[in-house]
Amino acid sequence: MAQLYFYYSAMNAGKSTTLLQSAFNYQERGMEPVILTAAIDDRAGVGKVSSRIGLQADAHIFDENKDVFALIQSLNQDKKRHCVLVDECQFLSKEQVMQLTDVVDELGIPVLCYGLRNDFRGELFTGSQYLLAWADKLVELKTVCHCGRKANHVLRTDENGDAIADGNQVEIGGNNRYESVCRKHYKAALNMGR
């Protein structure tokens, strides 16, 4: 029975690596996965999913206007698809999350989504908000703060390395602008404590 999975974490927990390993596992068994990634994240090139450890795969891209159900239905008609793997799923819209529930419920294809839970302001991304509400399975992937605690927040820094709490929710960047930290160090960096 197909299900909708949401694998979430702070940055640098291995979400893309886990997605690419899942794709490999399906392919090794002669099965066909569909890989999707957000058009906005072109750090590795448009239509590419890549991990920090050097793994990479081609992917179909989605933006806020893409009907992901129609895309997957069309691909499935051309060739049987055995799963859908979505990288950077925090950038999905509410409608796209609902379309992914239709992929599971109507097409019977498992959907595995990988992404950030919350942004640098400590607020949920739209895609993450609706995946938390609609996914059959929620799986937290863990990474570590510099103090050794579980990191569950993401700090954005300015050009001087100082933590900032203002700005657009989406700004594509890597380790030079973001740091995964625990709640205690997130609050301390933004002077949110008592």
Swiss-Prot record:
It is found in: Cytoplasm. InterPro entries: P-loop_NTPase (IPR027417), Thymidine_kinase (IPR001267). ATP binds at S9, A10, M11, N12, A13, G14, K15, S16, D87, E88, C89, Q90. Zn(2+) binds at C145, C147, C182, H185. This is Thymidine kinase. The gene is tdk. The active site is at E88. Belongs to the thymidine kinase family. Keywords: ATP-binding, Cytoplasm, DNA synthesis, Kinase, Metal-binding, Nucleotide-binding, Transferase, Zinc. GO terms for cellular component: cytosol. One of its GO terms (biological process) is thymidine metabolic process. Its EC number is 2.7.1.21. PANTHER family: THYMIDINE KINASE, THYMIDINE KINASE, CYTOSOLIC. It comes from the Bacteria. Homotetramer. It catalyses: thymidine + ATP = dTMP + ADP + H(+). GO terms for molecular function: ATP binding; thymidine kinase activity; zinc ion binding. Pfam families: TK.
